């Protein structure tokens, strides 16, 4: 297109010759190269510039948000310009890392809370495919109301219009945000009028359930999933609100150990007719390195923890709010240095664009529903792969060579060419994965530039077992494999004897063992002369995470124990039963000791009130550093945050199981435990634990009393991981159930009823311990 003229005034140019445009979307970020040059009357070029540009439409149809005529969901996060070393001066490398991590986690939207970003970031969002809720620098915070003061009207309008003028040519901008927490904000009416003169995209304001004319979307912050006495809940807006699409501008407050029940939010959202999605608060913890240490080049302590500081490091007067709000700046789903967390694993799973369901173990078939708005699932851009595991060990890794293209918004059934034969002696699981492929066709944008070839962008796990491993939970359902059943045990050789409160013997390898009790409590356990425990099992209901702030919780980790059936030989075995009584729960433990050194510990819990956790704590002896576990992993997961964590066999160390959340708190849970193997490589001894029934576990070198702060609830208590004392013994939890995390550190759900520990009934698991020599064991941390 060529235009001529001599006018120096503003001129509008219409490109009438463009047709058959390839539209831009976050799924297919196709960009054109636009070259603009200025020539003189002799056709000599005076100046020129080149830019990337994408074409898309954004419209509202009733209560739906449409991009290029198709309904899309906002799978978003709120972001901040923050860097642990540079503070608010975020560099390009970190911005790029953020965008790539978000794409890998199926995040498709960034809300620039609460100010526009530097232009480089919009170019990245255009190129990699990320929708942007572009927010003006108008933030009053919480109970402030400057935007209703007419004296601020001109300044506010100026900020809004400058944002639109600067960023209107970026296809990534989905809609505009007038600002944040400015009250009724009457000044926004005139601002919206001026903004619409320059761009037609929707305009939004976080109007806290108020039906305001200057917002094209309805919005509020931190709703619960379902209605409560003081919160209308997301489900109440399934059809939109006030005739507008409903957008959750902030939800799932991710402070500390968090992001519970995200799946339930999205079950409601994706089944709605008027909810467009939401943005998690927020992307990254905003702590920085301790400046005093940073100037000396010190970023990590001797025990390997980062020298991160938080709001309470800048409060000089205890209990006085000086604007720093304790730990309240650390609400990220990644850490300050952008480390992937268990929280992000959950987000990736819940946000994924593919649903796997209706798996048939006999037919080896699975239904795949394509939830992309535009992108087909075809052999040009994806590979459908699978991995078969036997008791957690990989036994087959394959792919589907030919499959029919699955159109956007459509389902199809796919046959997996699984070759593994299953039997009734093991648990067989299959992980089905959708893996990205680099495009090879011309005129196709490289939508995978953020990922390596073969990256699994969506997945699910199903049971292949013929064995009934379930105790009532339906097997073969995505993410719910049921709980393991321990077969009856027969000792293979060995001998034992009982003397008073001690059972001792020799196993089938000639190794001696001894277990002693006092008043029903295990006091010592040795194998081949080596200590296995530092403290025996006892009831423990204590937990402390940011989302528990609404609970006043003192430390509770002991019970009164009495012997109900004394230690005695019974045939070739020995048995003993004890009863324990603790606040809110009584329990019984039935011990069975086998000649080969195996010990069964069958525990039945009878709670009388709803607790944070129902389970036992114990301490393993120093040296048991190497860990292999068959449970959900590899990262920590909880009862309402395990959708993105699959059963598998993982190796690590106790030290590496720490979740380095900024403020120390309960960490490291792994749900649906089948087997745990602890190895002391120094002394050549190994202790295996197999599980029957429901159980989760965690391991730590840190005594949790170090972060038990009673009623302070982590707002002002100054505490860091590098302040804690690392003990040599291993603190272990074996829980029948731990309360779900919820997301109540700032509004939202405390814990949904499905994830609350029961306050009545009886609940049983069995732990089967087996010590053995480990001279040849060589477990490597991964």
Q: What are the residue ranges of the model-derived segments?
A:
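An acidic-aromatic substrate-binding cleft motif
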Residues: 22, 31, 45-109, 114-117, ...
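Extended acidic/polar, glycine-enriched regions
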Residues: 1-61, 422-424, 428-442, 447-480, ...
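Hydrophobic residues positioned within well-ordered beta-strands of beta-sheet architectures
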Residues: 1, 11-13, 34, 49-51, ...
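Extended substrate-binding grooves/exosites of carbohydrate-active enzymes
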Residues: 45-367, 371-378, 385-396
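Short coil-to-beta strand junction motifs in C2/discoidin
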Residues: 28-30, 377-384, 611-614
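Beta-strand/loop-rich accessory regions of lumenal/periplasmic or secreted enzymes
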Residues: 25, 417-425, 440, 465-782
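Beta-strand-rich binding/interaction modules
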Residues: 1-11, 365-402, 413-416, 425-437
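Repeat-solenoid scaffold signature
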Residues: 184-187, 254-275, 402-467
